[in-house]
Amino acid sequence: MFGWAVTFLIVALVAALLGFTGIAGIATEIAWILFVVGIILFVVFLVLGRRGRPPL
């Protein structure tokens, strides 16, 4: 997921350098959303992993 976020960030930077402001804004928003979702999933799985397995 972070790979996609980095990809969209690079697309946004290239588009911004070339003057395509609409495309740069959209790519930046997609990268930001993917980054936030990745962080949220990381925290959720970190918390769930620390609980351990239930006893049999």
From Swiss-Prot:
Membrane association type: Multi-pass membrane protein
Domain of life: Bacteria
Family the entry assigns: Belongs to the UPF0391 family.
Compartment(s) of residence: Cell membrane
Alphabetical UniProt keywords: Cell membrane, Membrane, Transmembrane, Transmembrane helix
Protein name according to UniProt: UPF0391 membrane protein Noc_0484
Keyword Transit peptide: no
Pfam hit, one: DUF1328
Transmembrane segments: 6-26, 29-49
A GO CC annotation given for this chain: plasma membrane
InterPro entries per record: DUF1328
